[in-house]
Each structure stands twice: as structure tokens, then as C-alpha cells.
Design a protein with these regions (language model features):
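Substrate-binding cleft and catalytic face of glycoside hydrolase catalytic domains
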Residues: 25-46, 53-193, 197-199
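Alpha-helical scaffolding within the catalytic cores
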Residues: 13-25, 62-66, 172-180, 198-215, ...
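Acidic-and-aromatic substrate-binding clefts and catalytic sites of carbohydrate-active enzymes
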Residues: 7-18, 39-41, 54-62, 144-146, ...
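Aromatic- and acid-rich polysaccharide-binding/catalytic face
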Residues: 24-36, 135, 141, 190-196, ...
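Boundary/entry segment of secreted carbohydrate-active catalytic domains
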Residues: 1-35
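Glycine-centered flexibility motif
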Residues: 6, 170-171, 219, 225
């Protein structure tokens, strides 16, 4: 218990009793695999019915409730994953009126949607699970390309790896805003992280480092999540160590 050793899990994975017992025996942190991602929590019908173009509505589906209830009942701290991501975020979230075929909204509208989305997610979860220990949250996920620059603008559902966030904002300003809003609404003591993969690629590592360093100096970001999709042949120990020590 000197530090956290965690695992990612989903509703399906914790359903068998053996899996529950394994998690409780070996880990003291859980990251919901899909259950806190935007496409799981956003409610298009409720957002349209609400009639407020800047206030996306959220829900807690059965899959999310199952994982969070398991963690709350067993005093398992969780790491929230994730508020802002180019993937698993429905296109309608970026469209006028939350309509499937609506025009892309302005930065000013998206600012308010992002803030309200983060607020609504946190408020909804805290209200239903008041004893849940959310000790960390991945605020922004996988915003960088391997060359160290931002992802190309566009729909990830049309162009693999493209970002509607970049389509709306055109630069990394949405990352700063996401951390600003998250810091405003997450529970007291919850640490905020930028999360990505392949940080051991030097160009990507340096791009992430420069951004996170600036966020940290502004007291907005507490650290970096390294997904560590590793094999025995790549990356080398030297590359991985260089990324950690950066």
C-alpha cells in the first residue's frame, strides 16, 4: 500500500467472481476500460430534448454503474478515463443542436460544451457514488501524432486518427481549456493527467514534454500517463528509460 498498482477493467471482465477476487487480491486501483469515455456517457436524445445548445446531457449506463459500484463497495480507488479524446467521442457532440448531420459548432460554443460536459460527468458520478475515491483523472488522451505535432483535423469515424477537437480549435488550446475545466470541477485531491502511448518515440516524447511542462507550470497538470503497449523487442530499454526520465 505504499503506492498504487492498478489494472484496467470493464463490466464484462469483472462479471466473473474469479476476476473480482483477482482484482481485489492484486490491485489497489482500477481504471474503467470504456465505462467513463464520452461515447458511453453522452446522451444524444436528452441533449437534443434539453434544447440548450451548450449543455450536453450525460447518463450513467448499466455498464458504468456496475464498475463504479464494484469499486465503491470494495473501497477501490479509481482513475477516471477520459474527458477529452478524438476517439470514442460521437461526432454529434461537435455539431449544432447535437444533431447527427448538424454543422460544426464554433470554438466559443465548444468551450461551453466542454466545460458543461466535464461538470455534468463529475457531478452525476459524485451524486450517485458519494463514497467513490476518484484519485486521478486522465483529462486529455492521445492528442499527439507520432511526429510530435497535433492530430489532423477531421472525424475519426471517417479518417482514422483524425480529431474533431482539432477541426473545431485548429490548435492545442482545447487541451489547456480541458485541464482548466477539469481542475475546476473534479473532487478535491484528484490528480489530473495527460495520457498517451508511444511516448518513447523521441519526436512524440518531446512534443508531449513541452506541452505538459507548460501545463504543469500553470498548475493545471500533475503528470503523464504512459500506456506502455510494450513487446519484448520494442521499445528498447534505453528508449523507454529516456521517456521516463524526460
Amino acid at each position: 500500500n505504499y503506492f498504487k498498482i492498478g489494472t484496467a477493467t470493464t463490466q464484462q471482465e469483472i462479471a466473473p467472481l474469479n476476476n473480482k477476487n483477482l482484482i481485489l487480491h492484486h490491485f489497489n486501483s482500477v481504471t474503467p476500460g470504456n465505462e467513463l469515455k464520452p461515447d458511453c456517457l453522452l446522451d444524444q436524445n436528452a441533449s437534443i430534448a434539453n434544447g440548450n445548445n451548450i449543455n450536453p446531457q450525460v447518463k450513467i449506463p448499466a455498464s458504468t454503474r456496475s464498475v463504479l459500484k464494484f469499486c465503491e463497495q470494495n473501497n477501490l480507488p479509481i482513475r477516471g478515463h477520459v474527458f477529452v479524446w478524438h476517439s470514442q467521442t460521437p461526432d454529434w457532440f461537435f455539431n449544432e443542436g447535437f444533431e447527427t448531420n448538424g454543422a460544426t459548432v464554433s470554438k466559443e460554443i465548444m468551450d461551453q460544451r466542454m466545460e458543461n460536459y466535464i461538470k455534468n460527468v463529475v457531478d452525476t458520478i459524485v451524486a450517485e457514488f458519494p463514497n467513490l475515491n476518484i484519485y486521478a483523472w486522465d483529462v486529455v488522451n492521445e492528442a499527439f501524432s507520432e511526429n510530435g505535432g497535433m492530430r489532423q483535423p477531421g472525424s475519426n469515424y471517417v479518417i482514422d486518427g483524425a480529431s474533431r477537437w482539432m477541426e473545431v480549435y485548429g490548435d492545442n488550446s482545447f487541451i489547456y481549456k480541458a485541464f482548466t475545466y477539469a481542475k475546476k470541477y473534479v473532487p478535491e485531491g484528484c490528480k489530473l493527467y495527460y495520457n498517451d502511448y508511444n511516448e518513447y518515440i523521441e519526436s512524440k516524447r518531446d512534443g508531449i514534454y513541452n506541452l505538459v511542462k507548460d501545463l504543469h507550470e500553470k498548475n493545471l497538470c500533475d503528470g503523464v500517463g504512459m500506456q506502455s503497449h510494450l513487446s519484448t523487442s520494442y521499445p528498447s530499454v534505453q528508449l523507454y528509460r529516456a521517456a521516463v526520465e524526460k
